[in-house]
């Protein structure tokens, strides 16, 4: 359900019901309504006609209804809104994703399907739109602006510029331009970014930002280009600067370690701005099921000391204003009846969820299972690669046979840094130093036949086996980490055979694998089964790497190729510098020594 069109007849029935001239279709009585406009909690009855809230009135004053539900003093909130999400991070198709989040109280999402778009182009966005049709989740899609995120430094499955953006922005299901990740292109006036921004501005729809690390004049220039939001907050000071600059903040749940600092900064303000919203950005399937999506973030913010009414306003009224949806975000006559019942404001847990006036979920369970749209074919067979051999995973220095070489390499995971080291070379092959591992990237979209790219990694520990994934931001090429070439080839070939996903290998065996045959990033499995497989993969990864829980393994791999961010990253085109936007030769020097 992208929109719900209220017919003239339905609206006129609502008018008459509000006047007591017709019965309501549904009357929710004795509700503790959370008023997002005033911050009050008021005891009221709420009358619903069709998909529309017809009346919010004192308890017992209008009682005629075809159906009545006594809420017995439970809290009633507007449906929750996620202002920025990549559904693909759940590795679930839209109908499976909707089953989880709707039951948790999320009724609207703003989906940036740029993961699908980077594999499939405009067809990937069309799949997102069509596969979401008919679901009890209001899916507003964004037109991805970052396909690829850094042209010239990576190659994805498509290239988007002005024409593609205009095509997608003309679709009624598309609500704006998705996060503008090519900050460098915006600030330097690249023709491609001018076309993309102009398409957004001319459409009258919103333009999402990705202002990671921007400050001062650069931040001001980024806003002047037309961007109006940011979810890439890095500190409390960063959040305040961006809020003062005029950006809508999208506090995200995928970086919970930052929440205490951000909340502390917000508490220094005279009041919490309507420019503050919340988003999930990326949530893996096991965490989505176990802890929740937006509702998990709201509970974390409450734990940090923000009033529940303020936190809920971020996820309802503020979010609706951000998404230019005056029909959502308030429990008021004339608004769509997307409603959530909570039994407590200390720990939010949805007891009932109403979508467009219909009871859709109760006690965390959907009233009925959701089915995939039978008229939409899920995209498959997107890993256009032949089987690989162990020799494809060897870092070489062709200029010498035996000797030493000084190489640039990637240091760190969350925020990568440049470093260099001198290595032994035997028979033209680099001997991986103790404490180092390899990262390997291969283009998988069939658009070029470049050889695999390899680089050294420092600060990740020594991998005892290999980890492979076809889900790696943002071009989603095939990525493998490890030290042993045979294990790396084994993990990569497991994904090529299954159509994508994630795999762990060690000592010639596949320890764990999650197949994702839909675009190399979505699974066919039921959500609970996928979550269990993903958790098993996460747990078994401890045999391969001594990394921080709970999911640094996957977040780190996914981010190692994110060339739009500052620092070194490896892509299918080589070792890149996110600051200078250049491809860098990893070889600094090499020299022969006696064998």
Curated annotation (Swiss-Prot):
Keywords from the UniProt entry: Hydrolase, Manganese
Entry EC no(s): 3.5.4.2
Gene3D superfamilies: Metal-dependent hydrolases (3.20.20.140), Urease, subunit C, domain 1 (2.30.40.10)
Pfam families given in the database record: Adenine_deam_C (PF13382), Amidohydro_1 (PF01979)
Coiled coil (residue ranges): none
Cofactor(s) demanded: Mn(2+)
A GO molecular function held by the record: adenine deaminase activity
Listed GO biological process terms: adenine catabolic process
Catalysed reaction equations from the record: adenine + H2O + H(+) = hypoxanthine + NH4(+)
Keyword Hydrolase: yes
Domain of life assignment: Bacteria
Signal peptide extent: none
Family note: Belongs to the metallo-dependent hydrolases superfamily. Adenine deaminase family.
Complex and partners: Homodimer.
HAMAP family associated with the record: Adenine_deamin (MF_01518)
Protein name: Adenine deaminase
Lineage of producing organism: Bacteria, Pseudomonadati, Pseudomonadota, Gammaproteobacteria, Enterobacterales
The encoding gene: ade
């Amino acid at each position: 359900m992208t929109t719900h069109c209220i017919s003239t007849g339905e609206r006129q029935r609502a008018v008459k019901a509000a006047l007591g001239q017709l019965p309501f279709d549904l009357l929710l009585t004795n509700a503790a309504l959370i008023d997002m406009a005033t911050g009050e909690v008021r005891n009221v009855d709420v009358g619903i006609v069709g998909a529309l809230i017809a009346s919010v009135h004192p308890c017992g004053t209008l009682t005629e209804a075809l159906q009545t539900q006594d809420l017995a003093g439970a809290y009633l909130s507007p449906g929750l809104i996620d202002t920025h999400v990549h559904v693909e991070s759940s590795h679930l198709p839209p109908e499976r994703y909707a089953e989880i989040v709707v039951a948790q109280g999320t009724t609207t999402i703003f989906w940036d399907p740029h993961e699908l778009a980077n594999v499939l182009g405009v067809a990937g966005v069309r799949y997102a739109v069509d596969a979401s049709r008919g679901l009890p989740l209001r899916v507003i899609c964004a037109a991805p602006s970052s396909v690829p995120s850094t042209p010239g430094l990576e190659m994805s499955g498509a290239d988007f510029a002005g024409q593609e953006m205009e095509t997608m922005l003309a679709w009624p299901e598309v609500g704006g331009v998705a996060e503008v990740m090519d900050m460098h292109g915006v600030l330097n006036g690249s023709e491609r970014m001018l076309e993309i921004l102009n398409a957004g501005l001319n459409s009258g729809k919103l333009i999402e930002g990705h202002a990671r690390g921007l400050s001062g004049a650069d931040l001001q220039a980024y806003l002047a280009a037309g961007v109006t939001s940011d979810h890439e907050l890095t500190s409390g000071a960063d959040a305040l600067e961006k809020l003062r600059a005029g950006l809508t903040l999208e506090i995200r749940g995928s970086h919970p370690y930052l929440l205490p600092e951000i909340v502390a900064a917000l508490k220094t303000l005279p009041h919490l701005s309507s420019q503050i919203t919340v988003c999930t950005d990326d949530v893996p399937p096991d965490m989505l099921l176990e802890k929740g999506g937006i509702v998990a973030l709201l509970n974390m913010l409450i734990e940090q000391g923000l009033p529940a009414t303020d936190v809920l306003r971020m996820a309802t009224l503020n979010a609706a204003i951000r998404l230019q949806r005056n029909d959502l975000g308030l429990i008021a006559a004339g608004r769509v009846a997307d409603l959530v019942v909570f039994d407590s404001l200390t720990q939010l847990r949805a007891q009932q969820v109403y979508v467009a006036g219909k009871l859709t979920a109760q006690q965390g369970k959907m009233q009925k299972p959701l089915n995939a749209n039978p008229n939409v074919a899920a995209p498959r067979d997107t890993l256009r690669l032949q089987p690989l051999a162990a020799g494809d995973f060897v870092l070489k220095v062709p200029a010498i046979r035996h000797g030493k070489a000084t190489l640039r390499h990637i240091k760190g995971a969350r925020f990568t840094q440049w470093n260099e080291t001198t290595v032994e070379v035997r028979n033209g092959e680099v001997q991986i130093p103790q404490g180092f591992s390899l990262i390997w990237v291969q283009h998988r979209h069939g658009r070029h036949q470049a050889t695999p790219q390899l680089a050294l990694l420092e600060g990740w520990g020594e991998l005892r086996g290999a980890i492979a994934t076809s889900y790696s931001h943002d071009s989603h090429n095939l990525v493998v980490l490890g030290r042993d070439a045979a294990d790396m080839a084994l993990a990569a070939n497991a994904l090529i055979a299954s159509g994508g996903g994630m795999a762990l290998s060690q000592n010639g065996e596949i320890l764990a694998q999650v197949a994702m045959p839909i675009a190399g990033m979505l699974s066919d499995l039921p959500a609970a089964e996928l979550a269990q497989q993903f958790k098993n993969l996460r747990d078994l990864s401890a045999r391969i790497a001594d990394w921080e829980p709970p999911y640094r393994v996957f977040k780190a791999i996914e981010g190692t190729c994110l060339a739009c961010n500052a620092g070194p990253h490896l892509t299918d085109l080589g070792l890149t510098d996110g600051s200078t936007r250049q491809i860098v030769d990893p070889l600094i020097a090499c020299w022969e020594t006696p064998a």
